[in-house]
A protein has these predicted regions:
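Catalytic and substrate-binding regions of extracellular carbohydrate-active enzymes
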Residues: 298, 306-309, 316-560, 673
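Catalytic-domain carbohydrate-binding cleft regions of carbohydrate-active enzymes
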Residues: 1-367, 374, 518-687
Length: 687
């Protein structure tokens, strides 16, 4: 390739803390095998004048290695770092960025800075791999942490946001150069720029190359760029070179968001408690009761960060691969049997066999040994981050956190005297009427009606069929010739077509009892009988509304939900009659972002949020979701992936649970769950 004088070669693997095995087993492999091998290889084949191999990892792995390696291993690592042979980048892990709180993200970024101080370096580059997109709210924290360059390597089957390959992502006076790749890492050369970037990636958790593979990689790249200096490099070095042409790069000021964010709805038990701990961390840090010098602070925050890390269990394909048992009876029988075999593949999985042969050989000792209990154990391990986080806190904070966790166990509330739905009640200054599903069907304050045609707190249960899952797969995914063998099993539900009586249906909940005690109204609702017995609808739920002068607190709790493998979702709808619904914004990482301001190919349908905020001439409304971050804009958009921006006329649908993901996510839920929302309304006086 003419005109290129220098080629930066980046050696990486992709860290999944799980997926290829149990998370702890994966981390052990880095401590015992991958990092020592990378260091030994670099020390063997590099010279100060000519670096052939530099291994780049997220800062978490270096920090973890420092805490678990032997003294001899640490001595070698220190030497490799001093020589520039082993290097971290500015982010600790690949995360679902929107799920992090500002405090968790601050800890994430602090890991690199702590290493920088220890070794006298200055990290300016960061990378995330696999997850296709992130929120623009990341720009300011990156910039403030000194990160100037972010590489995003997209999963090879996932939709790529329609942005320039390299651009300046700008928000509120801060910017970072973003480099997008349609793979984990692709070569890039920019017209008029005489340096190029090449990645030498190994597969997930596979560790570094050997010496022969390094030589072959360098020879391949040298042949591609005759006359150029080709050598191992770092993301920092490439980022520093890019600064020369920063002013030539296009500027993007729109949200991208995460088209994998629906995964955070797969384990409401874990996410609910994670959000509660994040809220406590915010409170403690603000008050000074917790500081970065508090014993246990780093490990507490690290465990919270690992919940937001993008890997949530073991790979369904390698460790379960049950594509046949869909009905509740068959699914329950399969769980009792526990072990699975490759006989549970269907004709839809024929192309998966080749992928499995590679995976079984490289990750599973050459044989398949599927098990429901083992697959479920990987999700229990992920929930273990909650317990591990609590264990690191000082006693007083730990007791406070444990009390908060205990309060999240739903308790059926039988209080109150019966009141009538469909008639207007005055409660704490509000005029309110309740509908036949327990929702608020009418809400007025100071003579202004905020809910007339909308609804607040409408609970719905939805099941999806093979047409939904297949259409979504072909709308969202790409490069089927190369990725289809494994991607359909990850992103769709192959075999679901054999559940021939399944039809896409949205089920309502029916009001069973409406009671009032003081300023609190309790709506007890019952799930549809067919939805509960055939699928996984909760049999009973309660919506508990507590009215204050300028706020309505809404608690949703459900009971008696069966585990179910059929694709399903639970939604709670909040629709207001505001004068200009286009003025709704979402709060992510403490920053307000419009749902209308999302690039094509980004996530225009769903987001993980802290709050929804409306400000118009008629007044202000905020909906704070304390435990359920996942929200769908304008409709129930779990499988609707048409890439259109949604109208906000119908409000927002909080997704309380879904099992859309395959891959490594939890795919069934039988927990009793609880979610709190706080609605604050201020009506503006009118002429």
């Amino acid at each position: 390739m003419s005109g290129i004088k220098r080629v930066h070669v980046i050696y990486k693997t992709h860290l999944d803390i799980g997926y290829t095995n149990m998370g702890q087993t994966v981390l052990d492999s880095y401590v015992q095998e991958h990092i020592p091998h990378a260091i030994d290889l670099a020390l063997k084949i590099n010279t100060p004048e000519h670096k052939k191999f530099i291994w780049t990892v997220g800062s978490f792995l270096v920090d973890y290695y420092k805490r678990h390696a032997t003294p001899e291993q640490l001595e070698k690592m220190d030497e490799a770092i001093r020589l520039g042979y082993f290097r971290w980048h500015g982010l600790a892990v690949t995360s679902h960025t929107e799920l992090q709180s500002p405090e968790v993200l601050a800890y994430n970024l602090s890991v690199s800075r702590k290493l920088d101080r220890a070794y006298g370096v200055h990290t300016i580059a960061a990378k995330m791999t696999d997850v296709p997109g992130h929120t623009i709210a990341l720009v300011r924290p990156l910039s403030e942490a000194g990160i100037r360059y972010l590489h995003i390597g997209v999963n090879p089957s996932s939709r790529v946001p329609r942005v320039p390959e390299v651009f300046r992502w700008r928000r509120d006076g801060h910017e970072v150069i973003v480099h997008y790749s349609a793979q984990y890492g692709q070569a890039i050369s920019i017209p008029g720029f005489d340096e190029a970037l090449e990645f030498a990636h190994t597969n997930d958790n596979r560790g570094p190359q050997d010496a022969a593979q390094v030589e072959a990689e360098l020879a391949r790249i040298q042949a591609k760029y005759p006359g150029a200096v080709v050598e191992a490099s770092t993301l920092d070095a490439f980022a520093a070179s890019l600064e020369k042409i920063r002013d030539r790069l296009p500027v993007v000021e729109e949200e991208i968001a995460d088209t994998w964010i629906h995964g955070v709805g797969s384990d409401p038990y874990k996410v609910c408690r994670y959000k509660a701990l994040c809220a406590l961390a915010h409170e403690w840090l603000a008050s000074g009761r917790l500081t970065d010098d508090t014993p246990g602070y780093a490990n507490f925050m690290c465990n919270l960060m690992l919940i937001a890390e993008h890997t949530w269990g073991m790979d369904f394909k390698k460790y379960l691969a049950d594509f046949k048992n869909w009905t509740k009876a068959d699914f329950e029988a399969a769980r009792r049997t526990d072990t699975t075999t490759l006989d549970l593949l269907t004709n839809r999985n024929a192309s998966l066999v080749g992928t499995l042969e590679y995976d079984l050989r490289n990750y599973c000792g050459g044989k398949f040994s599927g098990s429901y209990s083992k697959f479920e154990a990987s999700h229990a391990e992920q929930r273990g981050y909650l317990k591990a986080a609590l264990a690191e806190l000082p006693e007083a904070l730990r007791n406070e956190a444990q009390a908060a966790m205990d309060a999240l166990v739903p308790q059926f509330d039988a209080r109150g005297e019966a009141i009538a739905p469909g008639v207007t009640h005055t409660i704490a200054g509000w005029q309110v009427r309740f509908g036949g599903g327990g929702e608020i069907a009418y809400l007025a304050q100071n003579g202004h009606v905020w809910v007339r045609d909308g609804e607040l707190g409408r609970l719905q249960y939805e099941v999806f069929d093979a047409k939904d899952t297949t259409l979504a797969f072909y709308r969202y995914n790409r490069d089927f010739a190369h990725t289809g063998g494994w991607a359909e099993a990850d992103f769709s539900k192959p075999g679901l077509e054999t559940a021939e009586n399944l039809r896409h249906t949205c089920y309502a909940f029916a009001l069973e009892r409406l009671t009032q005690t003081g300023d609190t109204v309790i709506a007890t609702v019952r799930g549809d009988g067919e939805a509960a017995e055939e699928y996984g609808s909760p049999r009973r739920a309660q919506l508990i509304y507590t009215f204050e002068q300028d706020a309505v607190h809404c608690r949703l709790q459900w009971f008696e939900k069966d585990a179910n493998k059929i694709p399903e979702a639970l939604w709670l709808h909040f629709g207001f009659d505001v004068e200009n619904p286009n003025r709704w914004k979402m709060q992510k990482l403490g920053q307000l972002i419009s749902p209308l301001d999302v690039v094509a190919g980004g996530n225009r349908k769903q987001h993980a949020v802290e709050k929804l905020c409306y400000s118009g001439a008629d007044g202000t409304v905020t909906v704070e979701s304390l435990h359920a971050p996942l929200v769908s804009v304008g409709s129930r958009n779990l499988y609707n992936l048409d890439d259109k921006i949604e109208s906000m006329e119908d409000g927002f649908y909080f997704n309380l649970f879904n099992n859309r993901w395959g891959t490594n996510f939890k795919m069934w839920c039988s927990d009793d769950c609880l979610f709190d929302f706080v609605i604050r309304i201020e009506t503006n006086p009118q002429i």
